[in-house]
UniProtKB/Swiss-Prot annotation:
Gene field: Timp3
Organism of origin: Mus musculus (Mouse)
Name of the protein: Metalloproteinase inhibitor 3
InterPro entries from the UniProt entry: Netrin_domain, TIMP, TIMP-like_OB-fold, TIMP_C, TIMP_CS
Lineage: Eukaryota, Metazoa, Chordata, Craniata, Vertebrata
Gene3D superfamilies (UniProt xref): 2.40.50.120, Tissue inhibitor of metalloproteinase-1. Chain B, domain 1
Function: Mediates a variety of processes including matrix regulation and turnover, inflammation, and angiogenesis, through reversible inhibition of zinc protease superfamily enzymes, primarily matrix metalloproteinases (MMPs). Regulates extracellular matrix (ECM) remodeling through inhibition of matrix metalloproteinases (MMP) including MMP-1, MMP-2, MMP-3, MMP-7, MMP-9, MMP-13, MMP-14 and MMP-15. Additionally, modulates the processing of amyloid precursor protein (APP) and apolipoprotein E receptor ApoER2 by inhibiting two alpha-secretases ADAM10 and ADAM17.
Length: 211
């Protein structure tokens, strides 16, 4: 079993079954939570890949060209390789080589960066302007706040450091408007609330503030 399998639990990613009956299941995560809970957050382009171990628990190693680091300077100032399970049923991540720039998040284990399907990984050109601004500084400002998931009504915040995340209630599903356009940031008086960046006003989201 590779070191990544031990990290799967920490990343809220479960492997169900065994061999032929495996599945990867991930809990929804707001990009800000993904940012704050990751050891490493970078923008990079994949320039190569190699399978370093054969068999059902093979490991894919991607060679990357790091464009920018948003989080993790003290743990790993420069990332050249990222590791993931070879099988998608074990939460392994499939990335295109020499095609796109990606936003990559992950954990550091024994000096190596590991990532997978349960991490926040997205093509850079698919990120909204608000998400890009969040990566630069807004998400970091909100790491002391707590984003509380709401899967069904009624649901409420229970402390002043919480923002209620209601994307899962939307007919459009996840990722929704709050994921794409909002950060949960501590405001005056010590209360955390949703902060809207580049997106137009949305009256359906309560306790949101303009920049």
């Amino acid at each position: 079993m590779t070191p990544w399998l031990g990290l799967v639990v920490l990343l809220s990613c479960w492997s169900l079954g065994h061999w032929g009956a495996e599945a990867c299941t991930c809990s929804p995560s707001h990009p800000q939570d993904a940012f704050c809970n990751s050891d490493i957050v970078i923008r990079a382009k994949v320039v190569g890949k190699k399978l370093v171990k054969e068999g059902p628990f093979g490991t894919l190693v991607y060679t990357i060209k790091q464009m920018k680091m948003y989080r993790g300077f003290s743990k790993m100032p420069h990332v050249q390789y990222i590791h993931t399970e070879a099988s998608e049923s074990l939460c392994g991540l499939k990335l295109e080589v020499n095609k796109y720039q990606y936003l990559l998040t992950g954990r550091v284990y024994e000096g190596k960066m590991y990532t997978g399907l349960c991490n926040f990984v997205e093509r850079w050109d698919h990120l909204t302007l608000s998400q890009r601004k969040g990566l630069n500084y807004r998400y970091h400002l909100g790491c002391n706040c707590k984003i509380k998931s709401c899967y069904y009504l009624p649901c409420f915040v229970t402390s002043k450091n919480e923002c209620l995340w209601t994307d899962m209630l939307s007919n459009f599903g996840y990722p929704g408007y709050q994921s794409k356009h909002y950060a949960c940031i501590r405001q005056k008086g010590g209360y955390c609330s949703w902060y809207r960046g580049w997106a137009p006003p949305d009256k359906s989201i309560s306790n949101a503030t303009d920049p």
